[in-house]
Structure formats: structure tokens, C-alpha cells
């Protein structure tokens, strides 16, 4: 396990982006713990501000309403320092969000195979209950085949955006959270960032 000590002048944030089910939250929490930094999740920030779940926001007001709230939440992070931040999977679709995230720090794209993403979402009851479907159906009502098609379609749209924004890309398909964190820390060292 790699441990990093921080210097007083190190104020770079580590920004985790990627599709749902790639490990942004679990990796972010462990990375923050190892670095002794605060962890923030933009989806949690939005839910706290709105006093309700993202699933409820999307069901009642639609995706455009949620994306507006997401834009406001990300804009409010300007000036954030010395944190680990996990974003919602679609946060980068808004060019302003992408600009703010890139300006905040070092961006790491977490990826996984479509098969792994679908399996992770289907096997995580909390994830299925909390995350809204892009098709408008409740996540618990979507078949594996429908979820696979939805995932393929969304990834085709988002991967080019993710790749342009990312400073590093890590495939989380076959490695543990601890191994992913170790890899992120190794890459920081090789980039000569003071992490």
C-alpha cells in the first residue's frame, strides 16, 4: 500500500470522473482517507442542497432540472483546494462544468468494461434504487438487456468527452479499490505532483 505525505503548499484537488459503476465514490473515499483530505461527491452535494434524492428530482422535474442544479453545484466548488472530488457521470456533458473541473485539479477518468458496469449496477441494490434511469423507467424495473443497451449508448456519447478532460485513465474492471488508489498515487508521483 502506497502512503503519501503532503506538503504545506500542496493544494491540488484530485477529480474523479467516469460513468456510473466505475468506482468513483469508493475510490474517492479511500483516496481521501489515505491522503488525509476531505472527500466531496457532487451528487451528494446536490441532494443536500435540494433536500431530496437525484432520482426524485429527475422523476419530478426531469434531467434538465437536475443538470441545472449540477451546474450550480460544480460552479460553487471554484476555489476548492486539497480535496478529492467524485463527480456524477454526466457532469462533464456541460462544457462549463468540464472547464471548472479541469481548473480545479488533476482529473482521473475511471473506466470499466460495459459488462462490469452493468453487473455492478445490477448487483448494488442501493445504486439501483438511488440512481435514475436515462430511459425514464425506474432502475429496478429495467432488464439487464435494456441496461446494457442504455450503457452502450451513453458510453458512446460520453467517452470522447471523458478522454479529452482526463489527465489519466484507469480501468477499474479487474482491480480492487486499494489497487486503484495505489495506481493513482503512483501516477501522481511519476507526474511529479506534490501529493
Curated annotation (Swiss-Prot):
Q: Which residues bind ATP?
A: 21-26, 131
Residues recorded as binding substrate, renumbered to this chain, are 43, 67, 89, 158
Report keywords, A-Z: Amino-acid biosynthesis, Aromatic amino acid biosynthesis, ATP-binding, Cytoplasm, Kinase, Magnesium, Metal-binding, Nucleotide-binding, Transferase
| Location of the protein in the cell | Cytoplasm
**GO cellular component terms listed in the entry, alphabetical order:** cytosol
Instruction: Spell out the Pfam families in the cross-references.
Output: SKI
The annotated region (Disordered) lies at 128-148
Required co-factor?
Mg(2+)
EC numbers listed for it are 2.7.1.71
**Gene Ontology BP terms:** amino acid biosynthetic process; aromatic amino acid family biosynthetic process; chorismate biosynthetic process
Q: Where is the composition biased (Polar residues)?
A: 132-141
Q: Which GO terms describe its molecular function?
A: ATP binding; magnesium ion binding; shikimate kinase activity
> What Gene3D superfamilies does the entry give?
P-loop containing nucleotide triphosphate hydrolases
Which reactions does this protein catalyse? shikimate + ATP = 3-phosphoshikimate + ADP + H(+)
Q: In which pathway does it act?
A: Metabolic intermediate biosynthesis; chorismate biosynthesis; chorismate from D-erythrose 4-phosphate and phosphoenolpyruvate: step 5/7
The UniProt entry, under PANTHER family, shows: SHIKIMATE KINASE (PTHR21087), SHIKIMATE KINASE 1, CHLOROPLASTIC (PTHR21087:SF16)
Q: Its family?
A: Belongs to the shikimate kinase family.
Q: What does this protein do?
A: Catalyzes the specific phosphorylation of the 3-hydroxyl group of shikimic acid using ATP as a cosubstrate.
Q: How does it assemble?
A: Monomer.
Protein's recorded name:
Shikimate kinase
Q: Which organism is it from?
A: Syntrophus aciditrophicus (strain SB)
Amino acid at each position: 500500500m502506497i502512503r503519501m505525505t503532503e506538503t504545506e503548499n500542496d493544494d491540488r484537488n484530485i477529480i474523479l470522473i467516469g460513468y456510473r459503476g466505475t468506482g468513483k465514490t469508493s475510490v474517492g473515499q479511500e483516496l481521501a482517507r489515505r491522503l488525509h483530505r476531505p472527500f466531496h461527491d457532487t451528487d451528494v452535494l446536490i441532494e443536500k442542497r435540494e433536500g431530496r434524492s437525484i432520482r426524485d428530482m429527475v422523476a419530478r422535474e426531469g434531467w434538465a432540472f437536475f443538470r441545472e442544479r449540477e451546474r450550480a453545484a460544480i460552479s460553487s466548488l471554484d476555489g476548492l483546494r486539497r480535496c478529492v472530488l467524485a463527480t456524477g457521470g454526466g457532469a462533464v456533458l456541460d462544457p462549463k462544468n468540464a472547464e471548472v473541473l479541469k481548473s480545479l485539479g488533476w482529473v482521473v477518468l475511471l473506466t470499466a468494461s460495459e459488462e462490469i458496469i452493468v453487473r455492478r449496477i445490477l448487483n448494488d441494490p442501493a445504486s439501483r434504487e438511488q440512481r435514475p434511469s436515462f430511459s425514464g423507467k425506474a432502475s429496478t424495473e429495467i432488464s439487464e438487456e435494456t441496461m446494457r443497451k442504455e450503457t452502450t449508448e451513453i458510453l458512446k456519447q460520453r467517452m470522447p468527452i471523458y478522454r479529452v478532460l482526463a489527465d489519466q485513465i484507469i480501468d477499474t474492471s479487474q482491480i480492487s479499490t486499494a489497487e486503484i488508489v495505489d495506481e493513482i498515487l503512483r501516477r501522481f508521483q511519476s507526474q511529479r505532483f506534490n501529493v
